[in-house]
Design a protein with these regions (language model features):
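Polyanion-binding surfaces on beta-sheet-dominated domains and ring/shell assemblies
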Residues: 117
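DNA polymerase sliding clamps and clamp-related checkpoint/processivity subunits
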Residues: 1-112, 120-212
Length: 212
């Protein structure tokens, strides 16, 4: 599992891959280590789709990454308390599932006029909106198999969240998932779940915008 929080404590990501997701997995005991996400991401992106990636930790506390047959990297580990950060325990009132392509399009549509996405749900529909100096946009989806594949709302809920953070995680996950599942309650952190094929899942938590 991998867990990381941004410096401003606005976003938290929690990734869980079972050992069955790997071709080969060996771990003699619990090990905690920290890496710089920006550096680690750049390194992993050097791999082609056909490349195998092997990750080890050396005796001198270095992360060893082998890409394919001829690329070998060493990365210095860092002290990190992110893995000890407890996950938010929130009783969510609303849950919606949207195809990843539709969710990406919604973010792009709202970003034309706003830096924030407001999400509202009732028992039968989800509403995505944004407002800025140049104008406003409102997008309503009703449950159907093509776009809004699931909606479950115990009570009407609404929350406003940063598009900068949302766009970053959607671009990072890319086309590896078909559906994006969002859970939230009014004025509470948003939780987005991505299920990556049959390999594992990613949970992304995002604090709501606080009106001053």
């Amino acid at each position: 599992s991998f867990r990381g929080m941004d410096p401003s404590h606005v976003a938290l990501i929690d990734i869980n891959w079972p050992n069955t997701a790997f071709e080969k997995y060996k771990c003699d005991g619990d090990i905690k280590f920290g890496v710089r996400i920006d550096e680690f991401s750049k390194l992993i992106k050097r791999a082609d789709k056909s490349n195998a990636i092997e990750i080890n930790i050396s005796d001198d506390n270095m992360l060893l990454v082998t890409i394919g047959k001829n690329k070998k990297y060493k990365m210095r580990l860092i002290e990190s308390s992110a893995s000890d950060t407890p996950l938010p325990k929130i009783p969510y009132d609303s849950k919606i599932s949207v195809t990843s392509s539709k969710f990406d399009k919604i973010l792009g549509d709202v970003q034309v006029v706003s830096d924030y996405l407001e999400v509202k749900t009732t028992d039968s529909q989800a509403e995505f909106s944004g407002k800025g100096d140049s104008g406003e946009v409102n997008i309503i989806l009703e449950e159907n198999k093509e776009e809004l594949t699931e909606i479950d709302s115990k009570t009407d809920s609404s929350g406003t969240y940063s598009l900068e953070y949302l766009n970053s995680i959607i671009k990072a996950v890319g086309t590896t998932v078909e559906t994006v599942t969002c859970e939230f309650s009014s004025a509470k952190p948003l939780r987005i779940e991505f299920k990556v094929a049959n390999l594992g899942r990613i949970h992304f938590y995002l604090a709501p915008r606080v009106e001053s």
